[in-house]
Regions:
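Short, charged helix-capping/linker segments at alpha-helix termini
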Residues: 8-17, 27-47, 57-63
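Extreme N-terminal regulatory/targeting segments of RNA polymerase sigma factors
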Residues: 1-5
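Hydrophobic-face residues of short alpha-helical interaction/recognition segments
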Residues: 26, 30, 56, 69, ...
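Structural recognition of an alpha-helix C-terminal capping motif at a helix-to-coil junction
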Residues: 43-50, 63-75
Length: 77
């Protein structure tokens, strides 16, 4: 998976693919949590993906990334 590739190698292209694949989920979740504030939702999405980049190596190999991103977005909001 792209997550395991990124966690193993730190590959920027793999991370960009992760962001491209999951950005809409994270942004839409953030937008709902901040009552439609687009600027704040964008900031939250950046924070969530920054956290993912920092924590990818420590996530269990069976992590369901969409679930992790959703929960982390809710937690950050």
């Amino acid at each position: 998976s792209q997550l395991s590739e990124f966690a193993r190698t730190g590959s920027e292209p793999a991370f960009r693919q992760l962001v491209a694949r999951h950005f809409d989920l994270v942004h839409a979740t953030a937008l709902r949590r901040v009552n439609g504030d687009r600027s704040l939702a964008q900031e939250l999405a950046q924070t969530v993906f920054t956290d993912l980049a920092r924590q990818a190596r420590t996530l269990p190999t069976d992590t369901i990334l969409a679930g992790w991103l959703y929960r982390h977005t809710c937690f950050q909001a």
